[in-house]
């Protein structure tokens, strides 16, 4: 009986975490995403460029990139050196430019249509699970839970996982989060990690989850 009671309390704690995050950061996954894009292809490219780069800087770059090359066909035909020049501010510019050009060519071969399933997305050049989950949840509004460094950190601090493996964390969270809330949870954890639960100096005093968090630092 005690085990069942403990399990019920933990379930209620997790549901309350979801509720408070949704109250603090309202909106759909598309509304919560801070990357700027006009269609699934542009989000795919922006997400590739966002690796180890801020969304703000990516948006500055993609405004220029997409004004010149708004579609997969246009970007696939772009001069590689010109693409490298444009994406330079995002870091790792040669690798990112190469991936962007390859994925653009692959999407262009599909008639400009970005696939909407994990199986098909991860077959595209330079696309892993995190990028695929962003596209699935944000562009298509389907269940998907991107796991970045913020999601890893907050999931561990909140006692939602003991793992540091993004794939395992994704599976653990998806095992109890309602599918329709999965993308929103990921983005809310990311926003909370950027604004409150920072890596080095978490602001526990102003955190709406402090009383639910086993890692909270007492004031």
Label each region the model flagged.
Residues 2-219:
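Catalytic cores of DNA base-excision repair glycosylases
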């Amino acid at each position: 009986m005690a085990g069942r009671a403990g399990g019920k309390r933990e379930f209620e704690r997790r549901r309350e975490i979801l509720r408070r995050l949704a109250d603090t950061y309202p909106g759909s996954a598309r509304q919560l995403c801070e990357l700027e894009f006009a269609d699934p292809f542009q989000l795919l490219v922006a997400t590739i460029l966002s690796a180890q780069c801020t969304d703000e800087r990516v948006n500055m770059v993609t405004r220029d990139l997409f004004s010149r090359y708004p579609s997969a066909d246009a970007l696939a035909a772009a001069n590689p050196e010109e693409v490298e020049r444009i994406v330079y501010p995002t870091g790792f510019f040669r690798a990112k430019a190469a991936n962007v050009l390859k994925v653009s060519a692959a999407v262009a071969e599909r008639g400009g249509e970005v696939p909407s399933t994990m199986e098909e997305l991860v077959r595209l050049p330079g696309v892993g699970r995190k990028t695929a989950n962003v596209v699935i949840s944000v562009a298509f509004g389907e269940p998907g839970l991107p796991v970045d460094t913020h999601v890893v950190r907050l999931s561990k601090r909140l006692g939602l996982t003991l793992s540091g493996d993004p794939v395992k964390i994704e599976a653990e969270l998806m095992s109890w989060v309602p599918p329709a809330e999965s993308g929103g949870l990921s983005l809310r954890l990311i926003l909370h990690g950027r604004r409150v639960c920072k890596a080095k100096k978490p602001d526990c005093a102003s955190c709406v989850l402090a009383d639910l968090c086993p890692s909270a630092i007492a004031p």
